[in-house]
């Protein structure tokens, strides 16, 4: 069903109406391969069909959908929430007043301090949202076309603006591992230690770790082989030395009867969330006295990849270990190769001496 663009009594309510429609559209078009709680998703869809009263209510529904397993919804909703809040300062009376020039002005204000990767997320979300509006609004058998493409938005610096990921040094990693050994998470100590160790020693994504099932783990001599459901419904395997997690895995597996059961769940039997795992990492970093700009669990993956490349100098190995589709994605970790920088400095000195 199509609706007039200015379907509510004022700009704010009309924009909120369309944003809720868009979120509902994304919930039912994004990949649901990681969906863990269909009932929760059904409840969110029902609530969106009834309509929301304010942006906070819509925010809560988006978070509920993410916790149900549709993590991609926040990639679209969070940037649009910021745009919505900022546009309200302009005191517009109609959505038809929005044009590309205004959107560029808004994005310049709210993304100035963000990385290029985050700016690209904003660009994708904004273009996708207004494309949705182009196709869904109709009044007197005509649609208002925004045609927002942001081709000339200068907010993204390109390849030279790549931001290097945060990672721990070997010394910091030792402190972090000591913090794991001494950590006390009450009834969740064994489970929490196990998931963090698997991530840091294999470099898998948090989304991959929380979806590991008992049946995904097999043994081969002194190794555990873990079958991972990766991006794009693809599968790969990672390996970890038994001695690193043997006791923890043995204690956790005692409580599992079915090999189809997820390894990491809470006391209600529902899967752990990515945000929960990141909070564990933040606590451990704090206890270890390690301060980083980004303290989330993804930093463990960057640490694994960086130290692996520094040790082996093998970019293909990093690509295979991390499950990157492209070698260019793995190339970011070569920026931390001080040996190459020292060699360049030596060559420069030799040139000056000649």
From Swiss-Prot:
Domain Tyr recombinase residue range list = 163-346
Superkingdom of source: Bacteria
Give the regulation of activity.
FtsK is required for efficient recombination.
- Domain Core-binding (CB) span(s) in chain numbering: 48-134
Q: Principal place where this protein is found?
A: cytoplasm
Has the keyword Transmembrane helix been applied to this entry?
no
**Where do the catalytic residues lie?**
205, 231, 298, 301, 324, 333
Q: Which UniProt keywords apply?
A: Cell cycle, Cell division, Cytoplasm, DNA integration, DNA recombination, DNA-binding
HAMAP family for this protein = Recomb_XerH
Indicate the family of this protein: Belongs to the 'phage' integrase family. XerH subfamily.
The name this protein goes by in its record: Tyrosine recombinase XerH
- Give the encoding gene's name: xerH
